[in-house]
Amino acid sequence: VGNMLDIPDNDQRAISMAIECIHAYSLVHDDLPAMDDDELRRGQPTAHIVFDEATALLAGDVLQTLAFEIFSAEIPTFAPFNEVIASKLLAVFAPRARRMVAGQMLDLNAEASTDISQTDLESIHRDKTGALIEAALLMGGICAGATAPQRMALQDCAQHIGLAFQVQDDILDVTGNTDDLGKPVGSDEKLDKSTYVKLMGVDAAKDYAQSLFAEGRGAITRELGDDNAVLAVIEWLWQRQK
C-alpha cells in the first residue's frame, strides 16, 4: 500500500517490522501443544520442537513486546512520521492485535462444535485472520495520507481477503500436501476444527473463496485503480498452494 501511494520502502520498514513481530508471535503460539499442536511450519520444525515449549512461549511473548517497542522507538524517527501519525498508527494496530487473539480464542472454543454457522465462522476469522491484514493495509494508507474513501476501500478489501485466505487455508488442509504447504495436512480434521470445508464442502468453499477474492479486488479498484501492488498480492494469494 505504501509503494502504491508513493512512500519509500525504507520509510515503511518499521511498520512492517512491527506487523511481522505480531504475526510471527501468533504463529509460534498457534503451533504450541495447547493450541494446534503442529510440528512443522513452513517446512521447518516448529519452535517448541526445536527448543522446548517454555522457550517457544517466551519467544512469542518477546516478539509481541518488541512490536510495541518498535512503535515507541523506531516509527517516530522515520521521515513521513511524527508523534501524531505514530499515535494514529498505534490506534489501528493495537486493537487489531487484540482482535487476532480474541479470534484465536473463539476458534479454539469452536472445536468439535456441531452447530456452528457460516456467520459464526466469518466472525471468528474476521478477527483471527483478517484483523492483522486490516492493520497492515490501513497503516500503509495512513502513512501515505490516503483519503477517507481510500481508507474505507482498504479496510473493505482486507476484510474480504482475510476471509478468503482462511477459506483457502481450510481447502488446502484437505486438498494440499505436506511438502507444498510446509505443515501437516489434515490438522484441522485431527483437531475436529470448524472449517468452511466441513460446513459447505470443498467445491462450495472454492466458489466462496473466489467470490471473496473478487470482492477484495473490487474494493481496491474502485478507489485506487486497477494497476497497483495490492492487486498483485491478491492474485498471488489466490494462486497460492501453501
What residues fall within each predicted segment?
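Mg2+-dependent prenyl diphosphate-binding active-site environment of isoprenoid biosynthetic enzymes
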Residues: V1-T221, G225-W238
